């Protein structure tokens, strides 16, 4: 009979342990509410005792020991300590078990209470010994739970919300781009918002091409909208620096040929073979525009030698490194302009034979900006302060000090002259001048042809 009772105690004890493990670290939160600390202790009694005997010994033998403020009965009435849990099991005439005391006292009072438990030396009729195992900070357990749970919630939130947020953002961007799109000229051509006042424009085939360039921050594009070149494009080409940017298919080649015949195009760029401008990524757009070729070279190679644009581009890429290496290290001071002249006459617009001494000191910077649509800002020692796209020139001038000279591949307009003069710039060097009526005394204006 005793053996059967012992087995039942063992089964009950194991079951309770399993329940505590499954409950996890938050079991204290569930059972003890606002508890701050939990005292865990174990006891051993030299005889058979029951749970009420242990609880009675705890209350009885600590009564009056710690004064009225720490009396267990009063503390339990006021909720300063919770329900004392005791688990017991008997083996070989001895009783073993655990004691759990939840406490809302501070850490010092809780430690005193734990030490008081160890003074208990009898449980019922048997001698007993109690030892405190540990005091658990329930708030630390709660903090661990909060951190782990917050991670789970955040992961779920990111999985569920981010795709929806991205779609919402893209919809807003599309709406903004569509609003930025303007209609330009009598033909109401689709164009970016900077076309009316930009010194340079990019001519593309259709509305979708303009929208794609807007998406990637290029706001000076205008579409021809068909195979017939509108009069507005022809007129703009006489006043602005024009880059033709067409699709990489047969249709793009036909539009390019017509543009070169009827408009004053300065540069030619094309999408990669087989691709359209409207489907290009930002990286592909930037690469295509950086690889643009002067229109005179394209006209010569395409109409007189029968080559297509991509053959010209490959030839340029093969020869570009050797052209750059020769002038710089060996003949930088004087021979460089002499070697460059025949190449300039083939690639860039005709240059006058006589050059002023002032333009010669900017010669190497002129050669750099001719290759790309850029502007170079110089200080008094002719050191480069910055090299920026022409479209950012006006905003950059207003935010930088100590600019001595500006060299850029663009048209010198009256508006640019006024802004440059206000910022005490001494030299302004550009491709050509347009409608200049006022020349400030403190500003020297030069063109590539001078």
Curated annotation (Swiss-Prot):
Mg(2+) 2 binds at residues 247, 249. One of its GO terms (cellular component) is cytoplasm. Residues 199-273 form the Toprim domain. Keywords: DNA replication, DNA-directed RNA polymerase, Exosome, Magnesium, Metal-binding, Nucleotidyltransferase, Primosome, Transcription, Transferase. Binds two Mg(2+) per subunit. Mg(2+) 1 binds at residues 205, 247. It is an enzyme of class 2 (transferase). Its cofactor is Mg(2+). It comes from the Archaea. GO terms for biological process: DNA replication, synthesis of primer. InterPro entries: DnaG_primase, Primase_DnaG_arc, TOPRIM_DnaG/twinkle, TOPRIM_dom. Residues 320-348 have a biased composition (Basic and acidic residues). Residues 320-350 are annotated as: Disordered. Forms a ternary complex with MCM helicase and DNA. Component of the archaeal exosome complex. PANTHER family: DNA PRIMASE. Belongs to the archaeal DnaG primase family. RNA polymerase that catalyzes the synthesis of short RNA molecules used as primers for DNA polymerase during DNA replication. Also part of the exosome, which is a complex involved in RNA degradation. Acts as a poly(A)-binding protein that enhances the interaction between heteromeric, adenine-rich transcripts and the exosome. This is DNA primase DnaG. The gene is dnaG.
């Amino acid at each position: 009979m005793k053996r059967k009772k012992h087995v039942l105690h063992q089964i009950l004890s194991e079951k309770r342990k399993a329940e505590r493990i499954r409950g996890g670290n938050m079991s204290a939160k569930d059972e003890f509410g606002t508890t701050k600390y939990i005292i865990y202790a174990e006891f051993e009694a030299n005889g058979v005792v029951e749970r009420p005997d242990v609880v009675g010994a705890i209350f009885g033998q600590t009564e009056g020991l710690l004064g009225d403020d720490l009396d267990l009965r009063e503390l339990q009435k006021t909720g300063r300590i919770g329900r004392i849990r005791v688990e017991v099991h008997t083996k070989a005439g001895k009783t073993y078990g655990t004691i759990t005391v939840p406490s809302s006292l501070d850490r010092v009072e809780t430690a005193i209470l734990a030490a008081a438990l160890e003074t208990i030396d009898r449980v019922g009729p048997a001698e007993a010994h109690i030892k405190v195992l540990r005091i658990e900070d329930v708030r630390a357990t709660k903090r661990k739970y909060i951190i782990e749970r917050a991670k789970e919630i955040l992961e779920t939130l990111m999985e569920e919300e981010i795709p929806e947020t991205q779609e919402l953002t893209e919809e807003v961007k599309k709406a903004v781009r569509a609003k930025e799109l303007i209609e330009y000229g009598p033909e109401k051509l689709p164009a970016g918002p900077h076309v009316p006042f930009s010194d340079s424009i990019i001519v593309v085939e259709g509305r979708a091409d303009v929208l794609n360039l807007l998406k990637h921050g290029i706001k000076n594009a205008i579409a021809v909208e068909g195979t017939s070149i509108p009069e507005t494009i022809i007129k703009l080409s006489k006043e602005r620096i024009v880059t033709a940017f067409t699709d990489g298919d047969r249709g793009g080649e036909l539009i390019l040929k017509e543009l070169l015949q009827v408009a004053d195009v300065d540069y030619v760029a094309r999408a990669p073979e087989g691709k359209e401008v409207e489907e290009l990524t930002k990286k592909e757009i930037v690469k295509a525009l950086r690889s643009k070729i002067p229109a005179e070279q394209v006209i010569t190679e395409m109409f007189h030698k029968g080559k297509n644009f991509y053959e010209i581009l490959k030839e340029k890429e093969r020869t570009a490194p050797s052209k750059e290496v020769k002038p710089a290290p060996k003949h930088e001071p004087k021979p460089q302009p002499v070697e460059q002249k025949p190449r300039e006459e083939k690639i860039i617009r005709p240059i006058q034979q006589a050059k002023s001494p002032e333009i010669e000191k900017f010669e190497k910077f002129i050669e750099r900006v001719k290759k790309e649509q850029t502007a170079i800002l110089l200080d008094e020692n002719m050191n480069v302060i910055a090299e920026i796209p022409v479209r950012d020139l006006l905003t950059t001038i207003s935010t930088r000090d100590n600019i001595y000279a500006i060299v850029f591949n663009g048209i010198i307009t009256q508006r640019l002259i006024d802004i440059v003069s206000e910022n005490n710039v001494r030299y302004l060097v550009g491709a050509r001048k347009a409608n200049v009526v006022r020349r400030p005394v403190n500003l020297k204006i030069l063109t590539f042809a001078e």
